[in-house]
């Protein structure tokens, strides 16, 4: 039996699951949003909500696939890269986080599957991207570097601000 991952009903299911992911991820960030508002660090709010962006971009990606539209060049690249890097990166990050820092928790164990689910959707997105010129990757690379810079040096990466990481693990996660 062959499974068609581009079946419109399957894509509708992915759209619904990604929407649930957006709402659930936003709900988990409410205490952190309140902290940033109290500290008057409003500019960091969009940058630390990695999970919300992950599900939101996957939602748009599956919507484009469902509606049989072509991905815009920059937006399609952003959807793919964000889903690939942060989705599949969670398959590495959360086990290391639980092993070296926090210990086992159902919440972080669940995040392996929830974020990894979006990472595997990036494979669906990849097949529908237009080929890009090399120079068109520069804005995407700059955006990711800026996003990670704010995350690491301005407290946007909440795991680094809320937990004490061993030095070698922090360096590995920053430079992987």
List each model region and its residues.
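Aromatic-rich, lipid-facing transmembrane alpha helices and their immediate juxtamembrane interface loops
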Residues: 1-176
């Amino acid at each position: 039996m062959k499974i068609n991952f581009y079946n419109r009903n399957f894509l509708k299911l992915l759209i619904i699951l990604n929407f649930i992911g957006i709402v659930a991820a936003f709900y988990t960030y409410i205490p952190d949003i309140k902290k940033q508002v109290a500290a008057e660090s409003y500019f960091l709010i969009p940058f630390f909500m990695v999970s919300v962006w992950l599900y939101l971009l996957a939602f748009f990606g599956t919507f484009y696939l469902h509606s049989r539209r072509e991905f815009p060049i920059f937006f399609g690249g952003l959807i793919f890269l964000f889903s690939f890097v942060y989705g599949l990166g969670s398959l590495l990050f959360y086990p290391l986080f639980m092993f070296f820092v926090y210990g086992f928790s159902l919440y972080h164990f669940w995040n392996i599957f929830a974020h990894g689910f979006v990472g595997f959707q990036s494979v669906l997105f990849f097949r529908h991207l237009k080929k890009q010129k090399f120079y068109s990757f520069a804005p995407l690379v700059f955006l990711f570097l800026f996003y990670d810079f704010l995350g690491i040096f301005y407290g946007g990466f909440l795991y680094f601000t809320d937990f004490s990481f061993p030095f070698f693990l922090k360096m590995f996660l920053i430079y992987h």
